[in-house]
Amino acid sequence: MSSELMFNYTFSWPAGPKDVILTGTFDDWRGTLPLVKTAKGNFEITMPVKLANKDDTFQFKFIVDGVWCVSDSYKKEHVSEGIENNFLQITDLVETQEVAGASRIPEAGGLLCGKPPRSAGPPSTSNRKKNKRNNKKRRSKLKKKSTKNNKKSNESLDDNEEEDGVTGTTTEDVTGTSREETPLAEPTNVSKEAPGNFHILPIDQSADTTQSNGIIGGPGPVLVPNPGEIKEFTEIRDVDARELNERLNKKEEVPEPVAGPIVESSVTEKSPALPQADDPIVETKEVAHNVQELTPQVEAVTPLINEPEPLPTPEAQISIPESSKVEPVEGSLQSKLVEKRESTEGVLDGSKKVENKAKKDEEVFTLDPIVNKAPKLPLTDEQTAEGRKSPAVSEEKEKKKKQEKGSKEVKRSETSKEKKPSAKEVKKQTVKAPKKQTASPLSSSTEEPKKKKTGFFGKLKKLFK
């Protein structure tokens, strides 16, 4: 048997420093055992102390915030060369006995964990009195609760009996639900079980080990029953990516130039087979062109048809018969009037040409069946000269037209109830009246019928015919 002696001893240091470390002969003065700071602020640690003999001592020292120092609460010993250490003897260790039933905490440096030793002697009378009072209060509360519960249970039983009498059942058939009637669970003997044994679920050895549990470990690998029949497991091919891309790109580029000329040749071959346009198609185009030219003139005249014609002003009535009588005018004014007359004659000539074209189109393009008519012979020079030299005939026709016009205007004046003329008509009359006076005395006799035919009233006569 070994002669070593071992005791548990608690080393302490008062509160104040941040870190306290214990070192000594047990660790060859390396400073490896730090003290634990308690709730009070002091530092403590409990550790086993070994002694070889009864006369042997345990030498130690404290390192407080990096400074080696000795505690005054322990015995001191002077070593050679002026070094001072704390030490413990066997008598100091025997006084501190270990608590029965306590266990050590290795994380806390060997501190004890257990109930403190109970002090000898009887307990105090004050504690007994307090315990008795508390017990009496608890009993009284329990009695009150029990009486309330009994009353409620009796009332509920009476109600149940009344209901049973109505429905034909008794309370004997009903099972009790109170705590007293519930059976207790059978106690299990824990001592019979071995400390190291655990409950393990039974394993079905007949199941295939290849199949995996889908609930715990997921779906797992799939094992095919016939892997030899699947091509993907046996066939392996090595494909060069560059060669494959070059081959595919060449195939895509080849059809582009070939597809172009084939389409063009088919179009060029089929183009002469199209039917040529007939003559009536060309004529319809010309008619549409002429209609577009006449539309602005028709739009300018339509508002005059809808509106009732006002009574002619006295200025207009006087200017029409007196157009032939022109007084001599000075040279400067006469030149200006001649220029204006030429500009108006150009406009009137253009309107005549448009009207002649419209008449020709109406005569040529009709829906009636075409009959071969004798072509009109062109007029000779003599006939044209006779037409020009007979202004008297044209004057007689104009007088008849004026008389008819006067009768129509009188009828319209009665219906219109003396309505005033619009601003547009007054402007047209005032502008066109001096045009007839600007004619020179030499050419007045020959050009009077042309002006009257193309005047404002001449257009109105054509529309009312």
From Swiss-Prot:
Region (X-DNA-binding) location: 160-161
Biased composition, class Acidic residues, residue ranges: 156-165
Annotated InterPro entries: AMPK1_CBM (IPR032640), CRP1_MDG1_kinase (IPR050827), Ig-like_fold (IPR013783), Ig_E-set (IPR014756)
Residue positions, PTM Phosphothreonine: T182, T295, T366
GO biological process: signal transduction
Gene Ontology terms for molecular function: DNA binding; protein kinase binding
Residue ranges with Basic and acidic residues bias: 337-363, 385-398, 404-428
Description of post-translational modifications: Cleaved in the vicinity of position 160 to give an X-DNA-binding N-terminal subpeptide and a non-DNA-binding C-terminal subpeptide.
Other comments on record: Present with 2990 molecules/cell in log phase SD medium.
Role according to the record: Cruciform DNA-binding protein which exerts an enhancing effect on the cleavage of cruciform DNA (X-DNA) by endonuclease VII from bacteriophage T4.
Protein name: Cruciform DNA-recognizing protein 1
